[in-house]
Amino acid sequence: MTPLSSELVGFTIPFYSKTQKPYSNSSHGLLLSHNRSSLLTFSNSNPNNDNGRSFSSSGARNLQTTTTTDATLPTERRQQHSQSLGFRDTQMLKIFHRSCRSGNYIESLHLLETMVRKGYNPDVILCTKLIKGFFTLRNIPKAVRVMEILEKFGQPDVFAYNALINGFCKMNRIDDATRVLDRMRSKDFSPDTVTYNIMIGSLCSRGKLDLALKVLNQLLSDNCQPTVITYTILIEATMLEGGVDEALKLMDEMLSRGLKPDMFTYNTIIRGMCKEGMVDRAFEMVRNLELKGCEPDVISYNILLRALLNQGKWEEGEKLMTKMFSEKCDPNVVTYSILITTLCRDGKIEEAMNLLKLMKEKGLTPDAYSYDPLIAAFCREGRLDVAIEFLETMISDGCLPDIVNYNTVLATLCKNGKADQALEIFGKLGEVGCSPNSSSYNTMFSALWSSGDKIRALHMILEMMSNGIDPDEITYNSMISCLCREGMVDEAFELLVDMRSCEFHPSVVTYNIVLLGFCKAHRIEDAINVLESMVGNGCRPNETTYTVLIEGIGFAGYRAEAMELANDLVRIDAISEYSFKRLHRTFPLLNVLQRSSQTFGY
């Protein structure tokens, strides 16, 4: 084994174990079975995780069934003890307050448990803060533990339940949030509008509009009044699905309930119309607003301006700007950024620079979004020195570049073979308070690998994971390609399996890379298994897939099978004339040539 292969073997195991989801049930065992203990260790490595009570799918059910055993004093004695000592005046309560304020939630919970053992009644406000704190730490069992104590020894209110529901929703545990909602009702607590808005907002943000509308119906059946926020959330979600007419129906329903849409609601609809290409209809809505005495704001104008300029309608955009000034609606940073972006897109860099200068003269401070199109434009023109100088100008102007600005420069440097200069900038990202993201690491990995520095490239991926940055699809594709080039197809295939377990969808290019790797190794059965897996996972093979497989079968010594497959593919027009000629040059397929002579005019 070469030093590089040895390094790769040592690399792929920790890569796989760190990226593998703990709930994966993949049966591809080479690395998974080897690293099961590593996976378990990694999944439990968060110091804020609770290693006690399991709260998988039954977390909210535990809330319903758990009997707290920490407070063993009889009820009468607890009440007498609480009354005699004066709960709010105790030194322990002061410490509890202090630990909650400082964010030391583990210590706070310990104090809470100690206090209830002594007969003190838990304070609902502090417990609510504690619930929110544990959800911030992603420590669900501890958050549920606080609610258990509050229910058994205190008096929870709707705010405490809302905190629990909101925490579950933010962690995408909608079923648990629903169970808490049901529990509220069982304890004679009436969910308020905030409760329902939390549920509706969470469902909408996850694309579950149908369920969100059902929650709205439940809200109405509970005699709870929806608010402007309720309908605006639903309207925005409806617009994201392209349902302009449905969104307008929701607004009509909103008006029929005596609710007056605000500009945020109207802007949501205007934005949705513009995204669907209904710019004229969006302008009509703005005109109707003006007739109703509702003035569009700068956000409204920015939405319309972006839509017009994206269609190349500069003249209409200028008219809109004139109207904006006449209505005494001053352009903001976003307005100028839209104009700068469009000018750069159209190659008018000098005009964009002048606009940036005008923006500063107007007393506006450009942000990273204002500079980014200019940096990208300079990079496209190969003016790297100017782009890098712009980064320094941003810092001197008090605008810290974001990672998008830096990634643009890094990618251009690497593309131009200046990996060392890119590495120098990459190494200073932490010093300027801008942490690299997966795109930064992917760029550097590809550049280092292409330059021949493969070991350093692999260490870049390890550094990425050690910094808590999850690999993305580009990371996987790059790694799979590199491993296949080194002949390590089994490890590449394991990453392909891991990729799917992480809910990524390998593209046809990714499958073709692994397929080619197996074919080059003359492992045709494994190549066919990859093809079957590809089709089974809903990824349609392309012409490259078929030609790679035919060549692989032929070079492995199975000429007859290769010719048979080629015949079948020619018959169904899955292979073009160009690909057929290339195959024929590689090794003569006489039978195929005879049968397809009429097809390709031989």
From Swiss-Prot:
Subcellular location per the Swiss-Prot or TrEMBL entry: Plastid, Chloroplast
Transit peptide segment: 1-78
Pfam family, one: PPR_1
Primary location group: plastid
Repeat region (PPR), residues: 88-122, 123-153, 157-191, 192-226, 227-261, 262-296, 297-331, 332-366, 367-401, 402-436, 437-471, 472-506, 507-541, 542-576
GO MF annotation list: mRNA binding
Comp. bias regions, Polar residues: 42-64
Compositionally skewed regions (Low complexity) per UniProt: 65-74
Region feature Disordered, mapped onto this chain: 42-85
GO cellular component, as recorded: chloroplast
InterPro entries, per the entry: Pentatricopeptide_rpt (IPR002885), TPR-like_helical_dom_sf (IPR011990)
Keywords per UniProt: Chloroplast, Plastid, Repeat, Transit peptide
Domain of life per record: Eukaryota
Membership in a protein family: Belongs to the PPR family. P subfamily.
UniProt name for this protein: Pentatricopeptide repeat-containing protein At3g04760, chloroplastic
UniProt organism field: Arabidopsis thaliana (Mouse-ear cress)
